[in-house]
Amino acid sequence: MQESLLNSLCARRFAIHARWDTLLRTERVTSPLAYPDALVHLIEWALDQIFTLLRDPTVRKRAEHAGGRGTARPVCPCGRSPLLAFFLAGEQALLEALVLEQAAHLPIDPSERDAALGELYYVVRTLARREVDAFCAVCQHRHDGENGGAHHGHEVVHAAGPAPEEAHKAEVVATKPA
């Protein structure tokens, strides 16, 4: 990312923070830790990390190699990580700021525009994956998805068997004459 564009993004830090906060409050809450009031204090830390990574000269090469926008978002087996919504809101806020900043400096070279976008996606998603993976490593539900249960914030059905109501229905059906 060009230094001037990065400096302009840094100058928008307050607006990015405010937008991130707003977007975070529109996300679905998947657990008590995912309440926006529990997460907003992480925004400044995350912005520090993101701007530091964007200034790292090796990031451009890694982003180009990774395909930038093709960099995968983090995955949480049980879907309960509060950081999924946190980083999704942050990615959106940063993307909006980048697009507004680029539009303010038209005309812009399409390859530079795409490179900046790729670097932003790469940095945000790499940081998000690192933090989600760390959270998932200590999560009590991290193996729920491996048992064939539901994912992505839905109630997990454990391999131990059906819920008591379902077990009772199955018993009633099994005892009815054919």
Predicted regions and their residues:
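N-terminal low-complexity or simple alpha-helical regulatory segments
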Residues: 1-82
